[in-house]
C-alpha cells in the first residue's frame, strides 16, 4: 500500500458556547475577499438534503453579510459531480462546508485534503460518526452553522490526522456485478481516510 500522513483542518466549535453564544467577543476584523463554499447531497432523504443545504446556505449568507464573507454553492448532481466541482472550484473558496453525514464528510475531506483549507461539518446524516467523534453538533443545523461562523471569524480549527492512500499494489478486487478481475484495470486509488482512534 502506498500512503502518506496528512492533516485535515476541521472547523471547530470552540468559539461557541451553546447556552450563551460566543465565548468571547467576536473579532471585528473584516473577512472581505473570503469565500465559503457549501456542498450537500441534494438527493438524500428524498430531497430533504437539498432543503437543509439551502437553509445552511441562507444562514451562512446572513452571517456573511454581518462578518464580510461570501458564500457559494458547489453542489453537483451526484456525489462524484459534487466532488469534482469542489475540487475544480477550489481556487474560488477559502473554506468548505459539507452538509450531510459521514459520506459528505468523506467528500469534503477528499476535496480539501492537503490544501490547508478548513472543512466545516453540518452533521445531518443517519450516523454522523465522524462529527460525534469530534464533539460537533449533530442534527442541530443552526448550532453547527453558528459554530462554523465562529471558527471562520476567529480562525480556529482542529487538526485531524488522515492517510492519503494512492495505491494498493498487493490488493485484489473482484467486480461484484460480473465477477471480472479488475485489479489491473482500475485507476489508482486517490482517497483520504480519516478516523477516530
PLM feature spans:
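Intrinsically disordered, low-complexity polar segments enriched in Ser/Thr/Pro and acidic
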Residues: 1-20, 168-180
Amino acid at each position: 500500500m502506498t500512503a502518506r500522513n496528512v492533516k485535515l483542518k476541521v472547523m471547530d466549535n470552540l468559539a461557541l458556547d451553546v447556552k450563551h453564544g460566543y465565548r468571547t467577543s467576536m473579532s471585528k476584523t473584516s473577512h472581505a475577499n473570503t469565500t465559503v463554499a457549501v456542498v450537500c447531497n441534494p438527493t438524500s432523504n428524498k430531497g430533504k438534503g437539498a432543503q437543509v443545504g439551502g437553509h445552511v446556505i441562507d444562514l451562512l449568507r446572513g452571517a456573511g453579510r454581518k462578518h464580510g464573507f461570501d458564500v457559494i454553492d458547489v453542489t453537483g448532481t451526484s456525489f462524484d459531480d459534487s466532488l469534482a466541482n469542489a475540487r475544480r472550484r477550489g481556487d474560488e473558496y477559502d473554506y468548505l462546508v459539507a452538509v450531510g453525514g459521514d459520506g459528505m464528510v468523506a467528500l469534503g475531506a477528499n476535496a480539501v485534503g492537503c490544501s490547508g483549507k478548513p472543512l466545516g461539518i453540518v452533521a445531518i446524516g443517519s450516523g454522523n460518526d465522524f462529527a460525534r467523534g469530534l464533539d460537533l453538533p449533530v442534527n442541530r443545523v443552526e448550532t453547527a452553522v453558528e459554530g462554523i461562523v465562529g471558527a471562520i471569524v476567529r480562525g480556529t480549527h482542529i487538526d485531524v490526522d488522515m492517510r492519503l492512500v494512492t495505491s494498493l499494489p498487493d490488493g485484489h478486487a473482484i467486480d461484484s456485478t460480473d465477477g471480472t478481475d479488475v485489479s489491473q484495470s482500475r485507476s489508482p486509488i486517490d482517497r483520504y481516510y480519516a478516523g477516530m482512534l
